[in-house]
Amino acid sequence: RKVWEMAAFAGFLTGREAARVMLPRGRGTILFTGATAGVRGRAGFSAFSGAKHALRALAESMARELGPQGIHVAHPIVDGAIDTAFIRENFPERYQAKEHGGILDPDHIADAYWYLHTQPRDCWSFELDLRPWSESIYGVK
């Protein structure tokens, strides 16, 4: 239940309040951070995957509802270790992958989010995958 509350229900509450402020202005951006688990289930991740699927569906519904009113709703997928103190301290072997582009830089994630926010209305993206080149999707093991 906690996973669903943190991933899906919190997204609903946050999105609702953000939309409430943005609607009178006729513009704004709401970004719901997703994960690959929200697009494709995986054994052992039922609670997380279910919650992330719910968040993605919420984002898609809000995009259809709010887009015509000038609010850009997007669902960037962030998949991979992020260069944080938590990763450096608890997963030093993952952190070593930074030298080879195998860990996400928070500044680069921010650049991608800014890109979504500044897109012209005639070319809005809904989903953008952010992952290091060394993720298995690229055939690297």
Where are these regions (language model features)?
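C-terminal helical subdomain
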Residues: 68-80, 94-138
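A hydrophobic alpha-helix adjacent to the NAD(P)-binding/active-site core of NAD(P)-dependent oxidoreductases
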Residues: 3
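Conserved catalytic-core motifs of eukaryotic protein kinase domains, centered on the activation segment
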Residues: 25, 42-43, 87
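A short, exposed helix-loop element centered on a Lys and neighboring polar residues
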Residues: 15-16, 60
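Catalytic loop of short-chain dehydrogenase/reductase
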Residues: 29-54, 60, 64-68, 82
